[in-house]
Amino acid sequence: VCPTGAAYIGADGIVGVDHGRCIGCLYCMAACPYQVRVRNEETGAVDKCRFCTVSAETTGAKMCSCVEACLTGARMFGDLDDPDSDISKEIVATNAQPIAGDLTKSKVFYVR
C-alpha cells in the first residue's frame, strides 16, 4: 500500500518504516488493521512500535522496554518459532489468539 516502499518487514519479522523513504501520505495508517501507526508531527513521517529493535541494536537490550517496565507481567515478548520459549508455552497453555485473527498472520497475541 506504501507508494514509496517505506513500509517493510525485517528479517526478524517485525514491520518497520524507513523514515528516509516515507513521504507521510498516511496510506499505511489507513490500511493498518491494528490502528497502531502514528504520524510524527515534527517529521511528517509515519511510525509504529518496533519492539525496541533500534534500542536493542545500539544497547544490546534483550527485552522490549514496555515488557521490562510492566509491573504486572501483562506483556511478554519472545520467539514464536521456538516451541520451548516462554511466550510459545504461554500461547499453548492459554489458547491465545492472534490480535487480528488469522487475517494478517499476526505475531501479536492476546494471551490473557
Protein language model regions, located:
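Non-ligating segments of multi-cofactor redox enzymes
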Residues: 1-112
